[in-house]
């Protein structure tokens, strides 16, 4: 059964501005494993990755009904399969998490559906 759905839409310009103003911004948002991946990227792809993780973590906390604040960015970890599909490896939710991240122009969007595990 679906127990939560969260969506986040973010302007990548805002993430880029935060990244320029605060050198430590990526480490504030990304877990150690996510940061390793971030460092392996460059240019526009690096910004898309950071903005995508921001948006996905926001969407997940909205699906949980808490928003960022009660749950920190490091309480959630999102990695990718060998085919590039994002998946959640760490979260306070114990069920199935369905995640989609999209980039278009200057926007990134993430959608998260939370589903109870079948017993």
Curated annotation (Swiss-Prot):
Q: Which residues cross the membrane?
A: none
- Which residues are Mg(2+)-binding? 8, 58
Cofactor section = Mg(2+)
A Gene Ontology cellular-component term: cytoplasm
Biological process terms from the Gene Ontology for this record are: fatty acid biosynthetic process
Asked whether the keyword Lipid metabolism is assigned, the reply is yes
**Molecular function as annotated in GO:** holo-[acyl-carrier-protein] synthase activity; magnesium ion binding
Please tell me where this protein is predominantly located: cytoplasm
Write out the annotated subcellular location: Cytoplasm
InterPro entries the UniProt entry points to: 4-PPantetheinyl_Trfase_dom (IPR008278), 4-PPantetheinyl_Trfase_dom_sf (IPR037143), ACPS (IPR002582), Ppantetheine-prot_Trfase_dom (IPR004568)
Taxonomically, the superkingdom here is Bacteria
Q: Does the keyword Cell inner membrane apply?
A: no
Spell out the SUPFAM superfamilies in the cross-references.
4'-phosphopantetheinyl transferase
- Report the catalytic activity: apo-[ACP] + CoA = holo-[ACP] + adenosine 3',5'-bisphosphate + H(+)
- Could you tell me the keywords of this UniProt record? Cytoplasm, Fatty acid biosynthesis, Fatty acid metabolism, Lipid biosynthesis, Lipid metabolism, Magnesium, Metal-binding, Transferase
Give EC number(s), comma-separated: 2.7.8.7
Described by its record, this protein's role is as follows: Transfers the 4'-phosphopantetheine moiety from coenzyme A to a Ser of acyl-carrier-protein.
NCBIfam families from the UniProt entry: acpS (TIGR00516), pantethn_trn (TIGR00556)
Quote the HAMAP family the UniProt record gives.
Answer: AcpS
Q: Which family does it belong to?
A: Belongs to the P-Pant transferase superfamily. AcpS family.
Q: Identify this protein by name.
A: Holo-[acyl-carrier-protein] synthase
Q: Which organism is it from?
A: Streptococcus suis (strain 05ZYH33)
* The encoding gene: acpS
